[in-house]
Amino acid sequence: MTLGDKFPRYLQQPPVCGVVCNMEHNRPAETLVLPPRGWRITPRHALVAALVCWVGFAVTVWMVLGNQLGSFDSAGLQYFRAGPDAVPWGPPAVLEAVRDWTALGGVLLRNLFALITIAALLLVRLRREATLLAVTILSGWVVNTLIKSLVGRPRPTIVSHLAEAGGSSFPSGHSFNSAVVYMGMALALASLSARRGVRWSMIAGAALVTALIALSRVWLGVHYPSDVLAGWLGGMGWALTASAMLYRPARDLADAAAPAIEAATPGELTG
């Protein structure tokens, strides 16, 4: 049985992406088909979802600047602590698990995953999606940094910090940037699947993972609940806005850089 007999949906002729599989001698080469241009969330749907996120973000900012969320923030921070000494829930293993989870939103891991995703998209010739992801992440980092400097909210002191954290508190950088990176990755990688359920599962998974990263920052006592709420909403809003508004600039940039990328990417892999 040949590879074509076993996986007929994915093997066709003639070559499309240049990845050639010759599994048997004296037989025509078969080509692994990868999408030259995959699925993309429609700009209208992306902008509607982004608008919902931005409205929630704006309301949170307004309430924080008006000092209207003091009770909410205090209760949220103390919710994960027990007793008069405000010790965290559970055994030490729980604390380590939360620290490991929050690391997914840290600079090292989120950028490492982003670089791997961008490289994979370039490998399968989805240059526009790769460029859009890079532009989304870089611009999102700039936006979060600017908002932090403008608001200048100090870190909470209601409970002890269980992880190292520096800089301003609002909005949460872990929450904002992880939402930008992981939702941007989900939207880009969804272009590789022809199945609606797979695509939306990836998007929902990114939303859940980043929401838990945001929650971990409150659990560790380094952010107010309003910090992470605004960060998550803002990051989601930026990823969706970029998907709708920056696709064409990213396409033009990718097309302009195509000759250099083609020269650096192997044209064919023969077996």
Q: Each PLM stretch: what is its role?
A:
Residues 44-49, 62-63, 111, 118-124, 130-135, 200-207, 217-218, ...:
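Hydrophobic alpha-helical transmembrane segments
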Residues 63-67, 149-150, 192, 218-221:
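Transmembrane helix-loop junctions and nearby membrane-interface residues
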Residues 3, 7-8, 156-271:
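Membrane-embedded catalytic cores of phosphoryl/pyrophosphoryl-handling enzymes
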